Structures are given as structure tokens and as C-alpha cells.
Amino acid sequence: MARARSLREFQTSFAAETSCAAFLFERRWPQGFVCPACGAGRAALLRSRAHTYECLDCGRQTSVTAGTVMHRSKLPLTVWFWASHLMATHSNGMSAVQLEAQLGITYKTAWLLAQKLRRSMIDPHREPLEGVVEVDQAEIPFRADNSFFDPVRSGKILIAGAVEVIDRGTNQAKPKRKRAKYLDTRSGRIRLAAIADNSAASIEAFVRANVKTGTTLLTGGHRSYPGLTDYRHDPRTVGKMAGHIVLPWIHRVFALMKRWGLGTYHGLRRKHIDTYLNEFVFRYNRRFYRHVSISQ
């Protein structure tokens, strides 16, 4: 991956549909075309269908956008590429209003484009968290559509979060001592997800989906965690202490998440909370590489 350039430089590199299609072809078939049906290496570019190749052996037609959020979209590839660049490199994200202004498209198109890109930010085959992981739950505010001035239609939604705790000196997993300062540690990767409630079933499902078996879990001592017998459980009783003192890193993540949602989108919508969480996880996990864009 190459360091991101300015939008103008990026647009120069991907100024035409052909350059975007050539990039996608190279990423899909770095060693040359291979038919997904028969494995043959001979194909012809169709004139009747954009960016589509037909296998000369079996006749299977395959587009360079197949399996991506761009497939069967009526938008030019250049718009997809420019929008991806903006959303990947902008420090706080891009709202639909900003994409509308930057790309010269309608608000509806910008909104749909942003939603599809957010859904694609999470790799379904990503590696689970491991080592030492802080886990906790928090409530974040949301608002329904067009309810900015209507508190009746606003509320809070429960989310679960997990964050790796890393030693600053060795970059290895390090369990933080109770009541110890966290200046000698840093946060690693995170995971966030909306959950229905604080029940053992909801919390265990979140942990098993996002944290590797055998990992040390630092928690607030909630009664739902002891059922995770195949994890090392290190409960930190909160008692009268604030949660951010006992579990500093996950509560720092929660605080940043709330501030980001309010600052960038002026509040999160309940209906699309999963896509917003995906985007925040994406940005947090690549916070040291936020100027990295599409490979050149």
C-alpha cells in the first residue's frame, strides 16, 4: 500500500474508467486472467458489457467488479475510487453531505455510496483479538431520522467493546495491574458491536465472535463472564471506582466513539448503528496508517 496523495493527484492517477478497471484487473488476476469456472487463461474483453471478460474456453463472463460493492453499480468507477480515497484518508470520516459537495453527486447517491463503503470496511475473515483484552459494555446515544429536536425519539443503545492491551516497550500483550497507571501500555486492535442486552448469551456471543479462545479477559466482573470457561478471566471489580479507572482502554474507546459520532455525523442513527461501528473500528485499527490509500 502506498502513502496517500492529495485528492487531485489521486484523481489524476484514476482519471478514467480504463485506469480504474486496469487496477481492479491487476488486483483480481495478478498473474493474468483465470476463469473462475474452468480455470482457463484466455479471455476477451466484451464491448457490450463494461469491464467484463468472457472466457474463450467455456464462455463464462466475469466482471472486474464482481464480488465487490461496485458490482452492477451505475456509478462510474472513478466516483467509487475517489469516494473510497476520501473516506479512507480523511481523519474523521466523510458524511454524505461532504461527499455530495466533493464529488458533485446527489445527496441520495452520496448517502448510498457511503453506506456501501462502510459495510465493506470490515473483513469477515479478520483475525480475532488475542493476548490480553479488556471487555466491557456501554450505552451510546442515538437519534431516529429527523428527530434532532425531538428527544422523545432519541435514546441509547447498548454496545459491547473489546480492546487489546499492549506493552509499550515490547509490543507484547501485558495485563495491567489493578490500580496501576496505564502509561506503560497502549491499545491495540478493537472490536465493537451492538448487543440486545447484558445477558450472558449476548456477551458470550460477542466475545466468542471477536476474541481468540484462551485469551486473558480483563472485565468489570459482570456475572455474564464466568461462563466463558475456555478463556482466562481476570475480573476487575469496579465497586465505587469509575469504570474508566479499572478498565481504562476500553472506556477510552467508548469515549472516542461517542465524540466521533457526534462530531462527524451529529449523532448516530439506530437503524444504521452497525455500519457506523464498522467505520469507527476501521478508523481506530488503522489510526497509525490513516494516510494510506489504495495501492498504486
Q: What residue ranges belong to the model's regions?
A:
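Residue-level recognition of single "structural anchor" positions
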Residues: 1-296
